[in-house]
Amino acid sequence: MAPKKSKSDAQSIGAKLALVIKSGKVVLGYRSTLKALRSGKAKLILISANTPPLRKSELEYYSMMSKTAVHHYTGTNIELGTACGKLFRCSTMAILDAGDSDILADQQQ
């Protein structure tokens, strides 16, 4: 059984996500994330909790094919967009370069 995510885990992901947005390279949106997965540029995929199941399974399939890590964000697409500092919803995002953040190292564990 997977360990439960606590509130501090969600807050730490949010803080690391803000650092990635500021210092790294990210791609927001479903179509752009699929493009990054197909080209092999994506290092980590974040999928919000209310992403439609068909899109979620397609993203998981492409990430499995490209050997990219997937993180299921516990919040909705509105919360993921807000965590990125955007004023719009974002159901999926791909991290191309983590910058100064250690979000990729945490996902390896």
UniProtKB/Swiss-Prot annotation:
It is found in: Cytoplasm. Pfam families: Ribosomal_L7Ae. InterPro entries: Ribosomal_eL30, Ribosomal_eL30-like, Ribosomal_eL30-like_sf, Ribosomal_eL30_CS, Ribosomal_eL8/eL30/eS12/Gad45. GO terms for biological process: negative regulation of mRNA splicing, via spliceosome; rRNA processing. GO terms for molecular function: pre-mRNA 5'-splice site binding; RNA binding; structural constituent of ribosome. Its main location: cytoplasm. The keyword rRNA-binding does not apply. Keywords: Cytoplasm, Ribonucleoprotein, Ribosomal protein. The keyword Oxidoreductase does not apply. One of its GO terms (cellular component) is cytosolic large ribosomal subunit. Component of the large ribosomal subunit (LSU). Mature N.crassa ribosomes consist of a small (40S) and a large (60S) subunit. The 40S small subunit contains 1 molecule of ribosomal RNA (18S rRNA) and at least 32 different proteins. The large 60S subunit contains 3 rRNA molecules (26S, 5.8S and 5S rRNA) and at least 42 different proteins. Belongs to the eukaryotic ribosomal protein eL30 family. This is Large ribosomal subunit protein eL30. It comes from Neurospora crassa (strain ATCC 24698 / 74-OR23-1A / CBS 708.71 / DSM 1257 / FGSC 987). The lineage of its organism: Eukaryota, Fungi, Dikarya, Ascomycota, Pezizomycotina.
